[in-house]
From Swiss-Prot:
One Gene Ontology MF term: rRNA binding
Keywords per UniProt: Ribonucleoprotein, Ribosomal protein, RNA-binding, rRNA-binding
GO-annotated cellular components: cytosolic small ribosomal subunit
Entry similarity comment: Belongs to the universal ribosomal protein uS15 family.
Pfam families, per the entry: Ribosomal_S15
Entry protein name: Small ribosomal subunit protein uS15
Length: 89
């Protein structure tokens, strides 16, 4: 259900603006998207896991807030990010 440290590092390298960038909205949204994808796959086999479903809804809400922030600040970055991640919006 969780992502490995190696995968997280790869996501940070892929979406970061600089060497030490781990907190930009793009990086945070990419990590949240990976976690959401993993949880969605988990629910295909564990449909009654309501405790984890609540966590999924929290992650989706957090990602939505970050996406709204990015859209408000710089729409061009927002558009390229949702295109790269394959998020429908």
């Amino acid at each position: 259900m969780s992502i490995t440290a190696e995968r997280k590092t790869a996501l940070i390298k892929e979406y970061a603006k600089g060497n030490k960038d781990t907190g930009s909205p793009e990086v945070q949204i990419a990590i949240l998207t990976e976690r959401i994808t993993n949880l969605t796959a988990h629910f295909k086999t564990h449909g009654k896991d309501n405790h984890s479903r609540r966590g999924l809804l929290k992650l989706v809400s957090q990602r939505r807030s970050l996406l709204d922030y990015l859209k408000r600040k710089e729409e061009a970055r927002y558009r390229t990010l949702i295109e790269r991640l394959g998020i429908r919006r």
